[in-house]
C-alpha cells in the first residue's frame, strides 16, 4: 500500500482493419448495408492517473502529513529540480542552520515561499505542531498549551491538470506542459485550498476488491478466448480429416 499512490487507468485503441468487402451494391442494384472488416487487434493509447482522494490513516509520527484536497508537497530533487508528491512521510534532519524538513530519502521539503523549509537552532523539532493551513506552531515559554505561528509554512501546490504530471519514481512527480505550471496555494489563485492533517498519511486510492474482480474478469475472458481458438483448431483438424 504505497503512501499517496494514485490508481491508473489504461486506455486502448484499435489497430488497422483488414477490408474484406467495401460498402457497395449487389448485382441487382441493392445497396449492401455494412462493410466487411476484420480488426487486427488493439494497443495501449494512454495510461492516466486518477487523482481521487485516498483514505487518511493515523500514524504515530508528528512529522507525517496527509493532504486533504488537490494539493501536492514540493521537494527539491538531487538534481536541484523541483518535484511534487502526495507522500507526506517527512522528518527533520540536522542542517547547517538548524533543522530541515525532508522526505524519507532526505530531499528538502519546500515552504510556501518556495525555499527549503529550515527551522532555526533555537527551536526543538519535537515540539513543532502544524495547523490545517500548514503553519508551523511552537509553544511559548509562558504557555506551552497555546503554540503560536513562527512564520514558516509548508508549501502546497496545485495543477490545472494533475493527470499530465510526469512520474519519475519514488512517488515523485514532475511538472510538464500537459499538467500546467505549479500554482502555489499561498500566493496564486486556486479553486479550493487543501488542508493538512498532522500525524496522518494518505493511503493508496486503489480499491483492492474492485481490482481483484477486474483481474478475475480479465482472466476468465482470456480463458474463454483461448478455448475458442482451441475449439476452432479442433474443428479445422476434423474437417481436414474428412478428406482422408
Report the location of each language-model feature.
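Amphipathic alpha-helical polymerization modules
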Residues: 1-244
Amino acid at each position: 500500500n504505497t503512501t499517496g499512490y494514485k490508481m491508473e487507468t489504461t486506455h486502448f485503441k484499435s489497430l488497422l482493419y483488414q477490408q474484406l468487402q467495401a460498402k457497395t451494391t449487389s448485382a441487382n442494384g441493392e445497396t449492401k448495408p455494412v462493410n466487411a472488416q476484420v480488426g487486427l487487434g488493439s494497443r495501449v493509447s494512454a495510461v492516466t492517473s486518477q487523482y481521487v482522494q485516498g483514505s487518511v490513516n493515523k500514524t504515530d509520527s508528528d512529522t507525517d502529513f496527509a493532504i486533504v484536497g488537490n494539493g501536492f508537497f514540493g521537494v527539491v530533487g538531487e538534481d536541484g529540480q523541483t518535484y511534487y508528491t502526495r507522500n507526506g512521510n517527512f522528518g527533520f534532519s540536522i542542517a547547517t542552520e538548524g533543522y530541515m524538513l525532508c522526505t524519507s530519502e532526505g530531499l528538502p521539503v519546500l515552504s510556501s515561499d518556495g525555499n527549503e523549509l529550515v527551522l532555526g537552532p533555537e527551536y526543538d523539532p519535537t515540539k513543532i505542531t502544524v495547523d490545517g493551513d500548514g503553519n508551523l506552531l511552537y509553544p511559548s515559554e509562558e504557555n506551552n498549551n497555546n503554540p503560536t505561528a513562527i512564520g514558516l509554512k509548508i508549501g502546497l501546490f496545485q495543477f490545472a491538470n494533475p493527470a499530465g504530471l510526469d512520474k519519475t519514481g519514488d512517488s515523485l512527480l514532475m511538472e510538464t506542459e500537459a499538467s500546467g505550471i505549479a500554482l502555489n496555494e499561498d500566493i496564486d489563485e486556486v479553486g479550493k485550498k487543501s488542508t493538512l492533517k498532522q500525524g496522518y498519511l494518505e493511503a493508496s486510492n486503489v480499491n483492492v476488491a474492485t481490482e481483484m474482480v477486474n483481474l478475475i474478469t480479465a482472466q476468465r475472458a482470456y480463458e474463454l478466448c483461448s478455448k475458442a481458438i482451441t475449439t476452432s483448431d479442433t474443428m479445422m483438424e476434423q474437417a481436414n480429416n474428412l478428406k482422408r
